């Protein structure tokens, strides 16, 4: 059952803290030379990104309120996609993924026309709108899934597209590292406990 508006930071898409997650795969965790994987690795990576993430906290909170999205999920995606703008994330003038994806949340230019500066409110708003579109697509594709599973499926779709989210059990099967939604959810849960 969904908690009230205030308990979920105004998020209407589900309750982040009630979503099950296995966290980062060993492949994803190896970015930081972690010998651990799973939720613990996701939490460590989120913790490592917190100082940089806090530079964008005001924007994240503003966009989250306007879009009725959990700010911790936005932070989780930013952490996964660009390590909150880290130099080591491979960003060059805001571009990553071999010049195909733009900004903190890596909007793919092959499917969307990137808006704003790479670290701007306009960019985070656009990327959050894309996420919401994918959550709604998963809600339509899988109407029998719980609201929280649809939320998690939308996060997977943000990475791989809704057509590549094929089942509840294989939600991450076609995502980068085969762990995108699980890793983002685990990072987001950490950010939720740390001010987001």
Map each language-model feature to its residues.
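Secreted/periplasmic proteins that engage bacterial cell-wall peptidoglycan
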Residues: 61, 65-102
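Non-catalytic cell-wall polysaccharide-engagement segments
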Residues: 1-38, 46-54, 65-67, 98-99, ...
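N-terminal post-signal-peptidase region of extra-cytosolic proteins
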Residues: 57-58
């Amino acid at each position: 059952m969904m908690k009230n508006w205030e308990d979920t930071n105004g998020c209407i898409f589900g309750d982040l803290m009630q979503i099950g997650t296995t966290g980062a795969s060993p492949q994803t965790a190896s970015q930081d030379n972690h010998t651990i994987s799973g939720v613990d690795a996701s939490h460590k990576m989120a913790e490592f990104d917190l100082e940089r993430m806090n530079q964008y906290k005001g924007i994240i909170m503003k966009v989250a309120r306007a879009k009725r999205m959990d700010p911790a999920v936005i932070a989780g995606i930013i952490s996964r996609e660009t390590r909150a703008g880290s130099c080591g994330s491979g960003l060059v003038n805001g571009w990553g993924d071999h010049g195909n994806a733009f900004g903190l949340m890596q909007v793919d230019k092959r499917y969307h026309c990137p808006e704003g500066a790479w670290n701007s409110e306009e960019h985070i708003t656009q990327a959050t709108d894309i996420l919401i579109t994918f959550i709604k697509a998963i809600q339509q594709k899988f109407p029998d899934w719980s609201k929280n599973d649809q939320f998690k499926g939308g996060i997977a779709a943000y990475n791989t597209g809704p057509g590549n989210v094929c089942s509840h059990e294989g939600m991450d099967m076609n995502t980068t590292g085969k762990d995108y939604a699980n890793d983002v959810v685990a990072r987001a849960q950490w950010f939720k406990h740390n001010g987001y």
